[in-house]
Curated annotation (Swiss-Prot):
InterPro entries: DEAD/DEAH_box_helicase_dom (IPR011545), ERCC4_domain (IPR006166), FANCM-MHF-bd (IPR031879), FANCM/Mph1-like_ID (IPR039686), FANCM_DEXDc (IPR044749), Helicase_ATP-bd (IPR014001), Helicase_C-like (IPR001650), P-loop_NTPase (IPR027417). Residues 86-254 form the Helicase ATP-binding domain. Residues 1689-2009 are annotated as: Interaction with FAAP24. Belongs to the DEAD box helicase family. DEAH subfamily. FANCM sub-subfamily. This is Fanconi anemia group M protein homolog. GO terms for molecular function: 3'-5' DNA helicase activity; ATP binding; ATP hydrolysis activity; chromatin binding; DNA binding; nuclease activity; RNA helicase activity. One of its GO terms (biological process) is replication fork processing. Residues 1388-1397 have a biased composition (Basic residues). PANTHER family: FANCONI ANEMIA GROUP M FANCM FAMILY MEMBER (PTHR14025), FANCONI ANEMIA GROUP M PROTEIN (PTHR14025:SF20). ATP binds at residues 99-106. Residues 1249-1259, 1370-1379 have a biased composition (Basic and acidic residues). Phosphorylated; hyperphosphorylated in response to genotoxic stress.
Amino acid sequence: MSGRQRTLFQTWGPSLVRGSGDSGCGQPRSPAMAEALPEEDDEVLLVAAYEAERQLDPGDGGFCAAAGALWIYPTNCPVRDYQLDISRSALFCNTLVCLPTGLGKTFIAAVVMYNFYRWFPSGKVVFMAPTKPLVTQQMEACFHVMGIPQSHMAEMTGSTQAVNRKEIWSSRRVLFLTPQVMVNDLTRGAVPATHVKCLVVDEAHKALGNYAYCQVVRELVKYTTHFRILALSATPGSDIKAVQQVITNLLIGKIELRSEESPDILPYSHERRVEKLVVPLGEELGAIQKTYIQILETFASSLIHRNVLMKRDIPNLTKYQIILARDQFRKNPSPNIVGIQQGIIEGEFALCISLYHGYELLQQMGMRSLYFFLSGIMDGTKGMTRARNELSRNEDFMKLYTHLQSAFAPASTSDASAFQRGNKEKKFVYSHPKLKKLEEVILEHFKSWNAKATTEKKCHESRVMIFSSFRDSVEEIAEMLLQHRPVIRVMTFVGHASGKNTKGFTQKEQLQVVRQFRDGGYNTLVSTCVGEEGLDIGEVDLIICFDAQKSPIRLIQRMGRTGRKRQGRIVVILAEGREERTYNQSQSNKKNIYKAISGNRQVLRLYQGSPRMVPDKINPELHKMYITHGVYEPEKARSVQRRPFSSRGGIKASKSNKDGLLSEEEFNLWSRLYRLGDSDQVKGVALPQSHFPSLQEDRVIQDPTTRIHQLSLSEWSLWQDRPLPTHQVDHSDRCHHFISIMKMIEGMRHEEGECSYELKIRPFLQMEDVCSKYHAPRNGYNNVASVASSAHQKSSFRPSVDAGGSLTVIESEEEHADTVKQRDSKWTKITSLREKPCRAGRKGQTCEHSEGEGEDGDAGSSDADGQSPAEADSQVDPPSGERMADVGGISILGAVTEEDNHPGTLQMECQVTNKSCARYSLDSGYSSFSDEKSVSSNLFLPLEEELFTDRAAEQFYNCRPMTEDVLANVERFLSRSPPSLSGLSDLVYDVTQGCEFDNASCSPYPEHEHSPRPVSPASHSAGNSQQNLESNSAKRISHPTEKYCLPGTTHNKVSDRPSFCESDSEGHNIKYQNSGSNSCAQIQADLENNFVDKNSHDDSEPPVLFTDEDESLLLFEDDFKNIEDGPEELNGASLPPFNSISQPLRVSGKTLTSEMPPVSHFLISDELLLDDDSEPEDQIVCGAKSWKCQEGVEDGQEELRTDGQTFDCSVDLFSVTFDLGFRCSSGSDDEMLAGASDRTRTLGAADVSGRHSDKEIKDAGGASGPLGRAISPIPTETAQWSPWAQNKEYASFHVASSSPVKQRVRSTPLSKSHASSKTGAHMLKTLDSTKEKAGGQGFKMALNPRLGHLGFSVEETKSSDQVFVHQSPRRTEVEHLTSESEDDVFLRKTKKPKRNVLKSPEDQKNNEVDSPIHAVKKPRVLRSELASSDDESENFGRTCPRLEHFKGRNRNIRKGSAAQKNRSQVKTMARRFLDDEAEVSGEDVDCVSADEEDESENEQDSSLLDFVNDRTQLSQAINDSEMRAIYMKSVRSPLMSTKYRMVREKRPNMNIFSQIPEQDENYLEDSFCVDEEESCKSQSSEEEISVDFNLTKDSFTDEDIRYKTRYAVKIKQMNKKQNYTRPRKKLSRIILPDDDSSEEENIPKDREHSVAGGHAAAEHTQQGQLWASGPSGSSVPPQVLSDPSWNQSSRQRLQVQPSITDAVPRTLNVKAQSHNKIKSASPPCTGVESRKEYGNHPVQLKADSQEHSDTSAAPCSTSLLHVAEGHTAPRHLQEGNRACILVDSREITTGLEVISSLRTVHGLQVEICPLNGCDYIVSSRMVVVRRSQSEMLSNTSKNKFIEQMQRLQSMFQRICVIVEKDREKAGDTSKKFRRTKCYDSLLTALVGAGIRILFSSGQEETADLLKELSLVEQRKNAGIHIPAVLNTSKLEALPFYLSIPGISYITALNMCHQFSSVKKMANSSPEEISTCAQVNHQKAEEIYKYIHYIFDMQMLPNDLNQERQKPDTCLTLGVAMKELS
């Protein structure tokens, strides 16, 4: 052989010899030869490398030839021939080993595992056992048998974390685990499947059906077949069929079967005597059986007569036979049985099955078990109502049941503890003769065992096991044996709890019982089938089977518990009859199995493909060797030992030293002086017993003993006031705090007099932090003077938590404490309009309203100064313990105080019924009440005049937790039908972003008391917030004697001051007169007599007027109960509507008259945010027809101009993003700021619209009067008043009734509402100042998107980032009044005709029926600008299309979209189109999706908004067809809403400027040319999904250019090949969500996956048929493939404008579209960009399938996925860039084949992650949800599914639902799929919401669809390219990112990988977030705003168990951090 032919090793080996030979020739090498040497060496290296690779050929699988020459058999255990033979056989073939229990199956497994462990050094050896104890036992056995190092072995069960398991798989070689863990790890990809070389399956007879064993083998085979399987079982199966199934599932190629009779087994098996004892039933049991058979005949005969049950002997029928008959009846129902008869037969079947189960119990277990079963039916615990009713009517049954009840009812109360106590007094009743026989056998056994008093027997106490199938029988046996203690020490052994009423054993308890039984604690164990297999229960001498098992497996398993080490005995106790026959049949089956396996091999088909695993040339030889092993250490012990550091503090765990780390000298000193010895008389230490005064002392008093040293906390106090020396570990901060406290205590101990500590900290005292509470007694004395005596005393706003929701408030001031006197209170009941069940409070508790009777007519009180203090006691806990039953309502108990002619002070006890409000209320007010009588102000209840503190306002900024709860009450209120709309007028929505609050707690601005203009609360420092205002209580109210009459009460006079928390308000005389009924209520406050000095009159508050139902927290009497709407529950108060009859409400110098009840002034107003330093108006008259507002306002107030802004923080704070469910009239406020032409219109008494006569309403004086206060402008930094408030022509109210409740939700309660009783004055949405930090930063206001209903537009300016709400195209006359603040709000009311084409809206007539409020009707006027319509959006699931721009802007504000970009400040509505066109297309490109349409497609379309389409970007770069569609859309008549329904083309991509501008080359495609086929749009349902997307036509020049670069050429070529001329098709506008249809131009010939939505798709019609073809070919005809229209429809995105609104939070209300609309226009569903716009609106699924019945293919839901031709290997796979799909961990159990196919068949990278509701994430923007057809059919899971869709829409741009056909069970006949109404409506709703629907025939096809979706997303550069596995540092940030609302898992992953830290992310701009997180700009702005939202720690709730915020609600970072912690 030449050197060139030798290998490297051959060349190197003999080179020395060869070299010497050659040198002997004496021929020197030539230079050429020398030069060739390097080349020869390279070739040799190549050959050597080839041989090395060949040796590592996968065919050998890493087999080590050196180790493979031998196989080791241990001799440290006795060698048994059968074990040796079976081991040799199992090494070379997949083997099933069947050995009786106790004969060494585990030993054989250990031998085989060890040899494969040697042969394959890099392979894995896996042992699987069904239970954890078996896993542990096998691991220990392998160590003892073969000595496998423990460091190479690992045990993995479900308790092992998945991350740890993946590490174990990579580091360990021999693994012991349960099959479920193996399945999970295979699915996760954690198992190196190709490295598994040996798989051992214990208890292999379980490998049936879809058990985890079968799944493991199926998964492994997908990776490799090169592994050995060893199956172990005592019995291969219950019959031949089961054995064959095991062989097939486990790939068994050989069976090694040994029975107890086998010759090679006999020498090693101990004798097992099997005794069969047959017991007759007996007379008593026989009689009961006879009676029971009669009962069975009664019910079974009915089925027999109907020919649905076979005619057989009734006693011989079995439960199984009846079940089979029922299944047969269901499959083939008789044609004569229809309708209700079928249900009756089903009920009879169920009843017979239950009765026959009881019959079996009677025969096998006895009467007691039967009684327990029947009692479960009769007492209703089993929920079988029909069976109970039927049985109750049967006389024989009731007699039998009564008899059993008398015998066993007392025993039924006995439990296991009673058994263990051995209740011997009670006589045991033997319910079955078998029990007596069992007792005899056991007693005989122990008697005979104890008689053998040999030494050997004494060492081994006998143990007995009793098996019974039912727990009731187990308990009965244990109770019987307890009578024979202590001879029989019995314990039960059952499995886990199987239901609510059963208590089982946990695994820990099971192991404890087994251990005690094995160790001798018990000698008798009564067990269910749990003890049959697996557990090592030690040697058992006697096995008793109390019942027979039909399966021989269970019988053999039971017998295997004995006869292992010594002789065993098995006793089977059988009842005569059926049980005996069952046992005999079982034994026969066992013999047949052994005979079939061992005798006739042809019966079973064995697996022929078992790999040899050993190379052919190698034949391992047996090598017996003695194996030694060390001591086995349990896993837990080793894990503890390996832990180098302790879990706390990182201190190294080390053994403690006796010297305690003391030096020798120190130790000796301690030992000599301090060590306690016996002489010290201290033998132990004890803690002193604690004493709880509230608990009874039941403990036993122990005698004190001197030997016990009682520890004391104060004993070492002298040592605890200084830090002691430390060693290595320093003192903690907690320790230092403790030391300082102890030092302070020690210092204070010796003080006398005034406390030095108090003096020291008094300068730092924050009064709002001081908490106190006061329980005012009923009819008792309130010592207010004593309460108000200390310095700087303010009101406390801390509610008592234990008060059940009631609050106590007393306000007083230091300066006027001398005027406060004790008064006797008489309580008056003023109840809320409607009482409701308490939501968060104590259930079932009611509040008794004390009805006091006022005796005095004079409501005034006078003191020395002629001033009257007002007190408001919101009693926290009434002495009688009453609780309010109505949530959100306030029960106001007015106390008319009488003393010294001062009966005018009204004490209002306002009991907040919302307990959660009281619980969450925070104390941010003053409370210097140091004594226990200190009272807490109710920071919830708008007690108008009683709360005098100027600090009250700021306290409302701390009530966010309470408002959240109350807002939840509002949500409940909304579940009722809405009020009518006819008379309601729009809410003027005031929004500002310019307000700056310097103080989060909203100081009371005392220094501005005399300021000529109002001052922003934020303008005061924290120091100022500590100042006190002059007490209003020093002033007196002059109360004319007025009485009010409430139904059911006597006339009381109530004096009240209409101020809640404004100390600077003037006293107003308010007169309430309820003339709508016979009762009258007059509350008068003196406007002129102020409570403060006259020089502080600038601080006066305007009088209280009353808002409508949306603002006022009013409490009406019973006369208001005719109002249909209950009060809104807001901020703990009740918001009732008003009566239809209104009386004048006068606000003058003396009186303010209203028809409202006396408590109607309990309002939430904007006073919390405002400082009203203006004069009150002299007179404002609210007449029956008009408001009279006389100018009496000082000139100084004319200067006080501010932009009245309202803040809605409900979007940011709360999850209350729902709607009232109706639109409110916008027309009623047409003249809100109109000119004099509208002045003559007056407001009727019943008109709630808020329209006022201009000539009667003069200048409101800077909103100081009720009109101005109604708008309640929020002070901006310029502190100016609203222009409309100063419009002398028209100072109108802002009516809240036109807006949904969600818009009017306040984050804070508002104080003094100023509005007329029927005038719906606008209740401000005040933003908690605590939500905004101090500093010059303005409010980051998040507009509620539902503002769109108001018809306002919002314009933002770059300079000030302010929001303008426009409703009028004309500037008002007061525009010049505004200051430099640009937050001008202009509102103009308009009326729009209703135009809901799908649903008849409520008209004015209907509304009048619904509501007692009758509005003055106005002639309808056509809209001239965007505004909302009352009637338009009656569909709760719609957003108003005319307000889409507003919502878009609103959304941009709310989500932090690009407000900083240059925008034109639009001043008028007339120019909105131009401004918006430039603004949206230019600056908002980043935040508006390319395919987004800012309108709800399912909305009425008659608005003039559609005439001027300003919601598109088409002015920048559009194609012609788009322009045509826009034009056709714009020319629709505003009055004929459906005259033209134009098809909307796909709008340009978001990155429009990166695309080539499109050319206008073809006039035919000009936007002004309408295709002639457009007229046919609505005529052909066949064409509905034939949407022309062929943009490669030459007329589309730019599209042609763009698409030809990718796929267009191929498309054209395909069309040319098939000689197909494409006809002109309708260009239905199917919007691809942020997608480009060019990406899907690739239409393969071989595969088409279609998706059908709606009816056509699901029914597989030809329009939207599901072509579910596998990779082999396409089921679509070639002509269909060549049809461009089909091509286009295949590319459509199933996108319909998502009708995602917030009317009903829990339902997807997708309004069903009309036939014409769906056909004529695929509505521009926007993908997620537009869905994000509605992100916080729950989708409404209210699809009516009947409306869709005529639109078979209507929903345009066909989405056809295309695979490129020849996609055998995807492009990315060829390029090495595999597509990645994230799969939810829950899919491991339900979608195992999907995951496996994705990974093995399609080669995708699959990562298992906890996706929290997302089944599959295929890209950064698309999520796929997999649902089975059965899940879609059922109505039970519909709501859950809807909620899931809602949540996903807030996180993903695209959602796809795969509806998968249910898997058919083996042997079941295929059932015809029957659609249900729920199924159709759900599909329709999904389509309407823009969700793509795909249909799949199975999991394999689902995987194929997922792959195609992933490839499409990959081509769009949206694929997942980041690893799903995070390192430890990044893993810590993941939970925080996931806590951000609306963030998906993939987005969080992107943020983890792209941002090095959370800090970097928090400091990133929205643009950076958008880039790194791969989200659109809007989502990035949302994240940015969430992170940067200013948070006040005082906003944290007391109780963290609040309802979670919805994902789209802007939470604060502090709340997120709190959740993380």
